[in-house]
């Protein structure tokens, strides 16, 4: 963070930036400035225009009008190559790595020969506290480590303007602190950072200034110390919310055939001494009508466990019982038919077909059940139902999923999972990259689902989210669950963190 108001010329100054897509104005005369040695946080609801503005600055797309002043020079438009040459690097919310290449190859990919310094890369790895093997395949990394690799790519390019899009979305508190420490070191060298996030406590910790976007405009901007939390939330929230949003409470009842026949409290999913890649001897029971939280540090084995339950990874030992029937040998499709549905952590690579239409994506799992072929009119009607329930923002049902903002993509993925009529719904980081308003919509929906006696397994790195949502909580530590479920007053951030870090005293007390 900056400690002085003495500043040279701004690193970046965007003036009167306009952008339109398909006749819809997504940016309406944006002014945005970034100075040396400062963190300028950018907030806003889904579809507010944050990603579009950053893509224009990074040269990925061009503005219809307006200018970018960088280093004292004015530019009407940039290309990605030109942006890199000017020291601009965008670290995307969804890391864009080559999974079949090594970590080292990914970091060095596209660098000029003069920048190919192994010693520099090793120094950066050490400074960030990254423990991964440079020769391992990038595809073997979890989301948090892929995020670190993307940041390293930017640092290797001597970036002066670093754009971080939800950089802490999948990081643990300890990893976030380590990242912030490294960012402080970068700021001292004169680097400017645009920090896109929905986590207000983190923004207050790291940012010098805050700008809030709403409906393609800057609704609020100022020094962090001078803006209250109420001011920020009010600026993010639309002045008028659709009355149809309350349909999320009625959504489940409106979907024929989506009512599991289990009484509340009935055991629906039981794991008996499960062992697989990244976890061992995991036992737990998930009951109808409850939200069971699964917490733990990144790398604790939570996602690996979820993918094994859904049949995406090989089970090495133990039994998975769904409705008192073993499903160990069933395929993913057969598990889906029996009501086990999984919402993956990485929506872009695992959850959605980005080139397919929104309507097709929402009904993709039911297409498989009825012979794959889509019924356009029915799919469009289904999408409209979820649009009203989840307040999804889009222009037409035929548009590709990749054209939506990250938060609206997440809502499409949630709708896709709900349309598959789950009896057990496993949600892995369901609010990752989602703004405050949309997050509350998703929370309301998950509670509504559980109220219809669906069993919900909630995996989240956001411990406050776990505390708010879960009826019971298991914590994984180094691939194991070594304590009984937390309940009642024990479901709090402090207790969860102690268990996640292997607090033996807490574990013994809980058993």
From Swiss-Prot:
Annotated positions binding ATP = 44-51
Instruction: Cite a GO CC annotation.
Output: plasma membrane
- Write the Enzyme Commission number(s) for this entry: 7.6.2.13
Q: Which PROSITE patterns match?
A: ABC_TRANSPORTER_1, ABC_TRANSPORTER_2
Protein's UniProt name: Autoinducer 2 import ATP-binding protein LsrA
Instruction: Report the source organism.
Output: Escherichia coli O157:H7
Question: Does Cell inner membrane count among this protein's keywords?
Answer: yes
Family as reported in the entry's similarity comment: Belongs to the ABC transporter superfamily. AI-2 autoinducer porter (TC 3.A.1.2.8) family.
Fetch the Pfam families from UniProt. Answer: ABC_tran
> Subunit details for this protein?
The complex is composed of two ATP-binding proteins (LsrA), two transmembrane proteins (LsrC and LsrD) and a solute-binding protein (LsrB).
Instruction: Enumerate the NCBIfam families for this protein.
Output: PRK15439.1 (NF011967)
> What reaction(s) does this enzyme catalyze?
ATP + H2O + (2R,4S)-2-methyl-2,3,3,4-tetrahydroxytetrahydrofuran-[AI-2-binding protein]Side 1 = ADP + phosphate + (2R,4S)-2-methyl-2,3,3,4-tetrahydroxytetrahydrofuranSide 2 + [AI-2-binding protein]Side 1
In its UniProt record, a GO molecular function of this protein is:
ATP binding
Q: What is its main location?
A: membrane
Which Gene3D superfamilies does this entry report, sorted A to Z?
P-loop containing nucleotide triphosphate hydrolases (3.40.50.300)
What is the recorded function of this protein according to its Swiss-Prot or TrEMBL entry?
Part of the ABC transporter complex LsrABCD involved in autoinducer 2 (AI-2) import. Responsible for energy coupling to the transport system.
Q: Which domain of life is it from?
A: Bacteria
């Amino acid at each position: 963070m900056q400690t002085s108001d003495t500043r040279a010329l701004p690193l970046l100054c965007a003036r009167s930036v306009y952008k339109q897509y398909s006749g819809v104005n997504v940016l309406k005369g944006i002014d945005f400035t970034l100075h040396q040695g400062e963190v300028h946080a950018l907030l806003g609801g889904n579809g507010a225009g944050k990603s579009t503005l950053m893509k224009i600055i990074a040269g990925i797309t061009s503005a219809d009008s307006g200018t970018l002043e960088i280093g004292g020079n004015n530019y009407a438009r940039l290309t990605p190559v030109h942006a890199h040459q000017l020291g601009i690097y965008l670290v995307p919310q969804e890391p864009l790595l080559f999974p079949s290449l090594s970590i080292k190859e990914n970091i060095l990919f596209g660098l000029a020969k003069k920048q190919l310094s192994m010693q520099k890369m090793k120094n950066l790895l050490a400074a960030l506290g990254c423990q991964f093997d440079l020769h391992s395949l990038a595809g073997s990394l979890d989301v948090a480590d892929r995020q670190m690799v993307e940041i390293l790519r930017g640092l290797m390019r001597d970036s002066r303007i670093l754009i971080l899009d939800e950089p802490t979305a999948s990081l643990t508190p300890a990893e976030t602190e380590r990242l912030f420490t490294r960012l402080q070191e970068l700021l001292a060298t004169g680097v400017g950072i645009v920090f896109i996030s929905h986590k207000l406590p983190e923004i207050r910790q790291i940012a010098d200034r805050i700008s809030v976007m709403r409906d393609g405009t800057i609704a609020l901007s100022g020094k962090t110390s001078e803006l209250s939390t109420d001011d920020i939330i009010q600026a993010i929230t639309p002045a008028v919310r659709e009355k149809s949003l309350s349909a999320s409470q009625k959504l489940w009842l409106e979907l024929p055939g989506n009512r599991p026949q289990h009484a509340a409290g009935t055991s629906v999913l039981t794991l008996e001494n499960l062992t697989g890649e990244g976890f061992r001897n995991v036992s737990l029971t998930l009951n109808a009508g409850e939200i069971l939280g699964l917490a733990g540090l990144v790398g604790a084995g939570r996602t690996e466990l979820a993918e094994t339950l859904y049949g995406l990874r090989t089970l090495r030992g133990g039994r998975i019982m769904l409705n008192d029937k073993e499903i160990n040998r069933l395929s993913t499709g057969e598990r889906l038919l029996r009501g086990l549905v999984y919402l993956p952590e990485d929506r872009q690579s695992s959850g959605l077909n980005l080139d397919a239409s929104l309507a097709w994506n929402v009904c993709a799992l039911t297409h498989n059940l009825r012979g794959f072929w889509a019924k356009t009119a029915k799919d469009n009607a289904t999408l409209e139902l979820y649009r009203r329930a989840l307040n999804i923002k889009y222009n037409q049902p035929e548009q590709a999923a990749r054209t939506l903002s990250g938060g609206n993509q997440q809502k499409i993925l949630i709708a896709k999972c709900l349309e598959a009529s789950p009896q057990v719904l496993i949600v892995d980081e369901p609010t990752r990259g989602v703004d405050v308003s949309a997050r509350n919509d998703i929370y309301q929906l998950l509670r509504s689902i559980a109220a219809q006696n669906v069993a919900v397994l909630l995996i989240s790195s956001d411990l406050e989210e776990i505390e708010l949502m879960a009826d019971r909580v298991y914590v994984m530590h180094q691939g194991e669950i070594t304590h009984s479920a937390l309940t009642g007053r024990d479901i709090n951030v402090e207790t969860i963190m102690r268990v996640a870090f292997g607090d033996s005293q807490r574990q013994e007390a809980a058993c």
